[in-house]
Amino acid sequence: MKLIAASLRRLSLAVLTVLLVVSSFAVFTPSAAAETYTVKLGSDKGLLVFEPAKLTIKPGDTVEFLNNKVPPHNVVFDATLNPAKSADLAKSLSHKQLLMSPGQSTSTTFPADAPAGDYSFYCEPHRGAGMVGKITVAS
């Protein structure tokens, strides 16, 4: 009888240990981390462009806009050219203040509930020269 009780105790401890290990993986598995991407304002060759001009991200990701060449630059998201057609969303993503010096940066974090689709943006001083870009938020 003692032998059976001891065997059951060992079996119970083994099962409990396995359950504890398995459940700790479920609790401590990190969720998908948001990423940060960099978009240069002005090319390395001094062209009035965003580099890259097109970028694909996920909701919750951050885009850093780095003033590179030929300042001043800013980043304005077009209210009519975003999936939500929302002026408030475009305003919250935009940075209208001009970055005057190379190396200055500003960043935008896309909300976790940002609708999937294309978000068009431009540099106000250089829009006429073709300084426009597009960020695609993937679902």
Curated annotation (Swiss-Prot):
Residues 35-135 form the Plastocyanin-like domain. CDD domains: Plastocyanin (cd04219). Cu cation binds at H73, C123, H126, M131. The keyword Transport applies. It is a peripheral membrane protein. PANTHER family: PLASTOCYANIN MAJOR ISOFORM, CHLOROPLASTIC-RELATED (PTHR34192:SF10). This is Plastocyanin. The gene is petE.
